[in-house]
């Protein structure tokens, strides 16, 4: 693993590069797109393991923090959906230069999957876009976070304006507006690459997205791999999720070890 900073020197992004550990490097590389806030914390260990397994399979892998998150530059209230999608594009270009490849696959979890799907509509250098338990509709996603926070705080308050705290992380009005506009059912087809949705359980929102893509004749491979997927839960111990079956399934998908 090689930690480093990249992108704009005045607002650098923090990344960890995993070089290929197999004898022969693959011709494509992989960018991992994290979820946000408490889901980031729950997923960090899983992403690290996924990156290691992919590097052992011969991929160059980059996992990174969006602007205003983790160890990247920016205050925690400075980012928004537009900036985070731009960060993914920056990470793609950085990995292509670092690994010397022309094609990159994206693996995104939760909001990271939603952002990856948006980026894919604009890129012609993608091989696969793996949407792992994606946030299909942003409005109910945000509403659930806000209601849960209100319940935990033991009081109701107007959260329609300004910045509120979500598990210790700021949710600004700009962030909220961007997240609420997410609706993968209206997704523009990827400009390149194959789109794959890998889900831990068959929630109604996942099935609705699959059916919407089928109705619009947008290619989507749908895989249900039963495993833990309660990313939005967090306890006082900061427990991580490490769903081995779905991690192995994503590796198999990217290495063509699964039958399409």
Ranges and model annotations:
Residues 1-24, 219, 234:
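An N-terminal hydrophobic leader/cap segment in hydrolases
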Residues 123-256, 260:
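The alpha/beta-hydrolase serine catalytic core
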Residues 107-117, 133:
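Gly/Ala-rich beta-loop-alpha elbow adjacent to hydrolase catalytic centers
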Residues 118-122:
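Active-site signature of alpha/beta-hydrolase-fold catalytic machinery across serine-
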Residues 46-47, 75-80, 236-240:
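Short glycine-enriched, charge-decorated loop/helix-capping segments at active-site entrances
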Residues 69-103:
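Catalytic nucleophile-loop/oxyanion-hole region of alpha/beta-hydrolase
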Residues 36, 60-70, 135, 226-228:
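Short beta-to-alpha linker loops that shape the active-site pocket of alpha/beta-hydrolase fold enzymes
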Residues 7-10, 19-65, 94:
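Short, surface-exposed "cap/lid" segments of acyl-processing enzymes
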């Amino acid at each position: 693993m090689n930690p480093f900073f990249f992108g704009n020197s005045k607002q650098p992004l923090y990344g960890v590069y995993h070089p290929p550990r197999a004898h022969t490097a693959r011709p494509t590389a992989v960018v991992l797109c994290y979820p946000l806030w408490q889901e980031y914390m729950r997923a960090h260990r899983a992403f690290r393991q996924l990156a290691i397994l992919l590097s052992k399979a011969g991929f160059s892998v980059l996992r990174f923090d969006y602007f205003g998150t983790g160890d990247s530059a920016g205050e925690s209230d400075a980012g928004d959906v537009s900036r985070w999608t731009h960060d993914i594009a920056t990470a793609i270009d950085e990995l292509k230069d670092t690994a010397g490849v022309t094609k990159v696959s994206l693996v995104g979890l939760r909001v990271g999957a939603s952002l990856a799907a948006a980026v894919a509509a604009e890129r012609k250098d993608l091989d696969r876009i793996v949407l792992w338990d994606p946030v299909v509709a942003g409005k109910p996603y945000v509403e659930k976070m806000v209601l849960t926070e209100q319940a935990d705080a033991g009081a109701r308050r107007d959260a329609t304006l300004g910045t509120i705290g979500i598990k210790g992380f700021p949710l600004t009005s700009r962030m909220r507006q961007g997240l609420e506009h997410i609706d993968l059912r209206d997704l523009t087809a990827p400009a390149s690459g194959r789109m794959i949705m890998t889900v831990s359980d068959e929630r109604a929102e996942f099935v609705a997205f699959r059916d919407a893509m089928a109705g619009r004749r947008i290619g989507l491979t749908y895989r249900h791999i039963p495993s833990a997927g309660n990313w939005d839960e967090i306890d006082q111990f900061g427990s991580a999720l490490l769903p081995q079956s779905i991690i192995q399934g994503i590796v198999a998908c990217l290495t063509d070890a699964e039958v399409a």
